[in-house]
Amino acid sequence: MRFLRAAFILSLVVLLYPASLPAEEPVIVDLTQTPCTIVEAEEHPREFVSTNSRECVRINRETAGERTFKVLRLKPGRTIFRVTNRNVPYPLGFWVRGKGLGRVTLPSVSGGGLDEGKTRDYVIDLKPGVYLYSCPLNPTPDYPLIVEGK
């Protein structure tokens, strides 16, 4: 009798354990890089012209006070940042990292090799916290990302 009771309880645990449930589909965030900017992150995207990253450093410095950014808000979990290089004539990349001390404690993803006209996926398992995302090769400003909820 004890054996049957133990087997029944074990069966319930196996059936009801959350890990046995199908994993949620990842969230896909589509982003478009144009010279000196990530379009979806800007309140009022502008069409800058740049043939190299040095020009973007100058453009970003000169326009810093005029530009406002949208806060990207996501829930924790597997996230795919699908990034497209639109009309930037040099290879780009993408970088998500924690802000401040979060840079040490939160997950990060980065990569390069994003040529003009190409799209690349950057996959990360986001945890709650405050992040920044940008392209250091374009370069773009650091855009805010807040991950909260369940």
Predicted regions and their residues:
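Sec/Tat signal peptide C-region and signal peptidase I cleavage site
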Residues: 19-23
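Bacterial N-terminal signal peptides
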Residues: 7-17
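Extracellular/periplasmic metallocenter environments
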Residues: 24-31, 35-53, 63-66, 89, ...
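N-terminal post-signal-peptidase region of extra-cytosolic proteins
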Residues: 59-71, 76, 81, 107, ...
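Contiguous segments within soluble domain cores/interaction surfaces
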Residues: 72-105
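Positively charged n-region of N-terminal signal peptides that target proteins for export
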Residues: 1-5
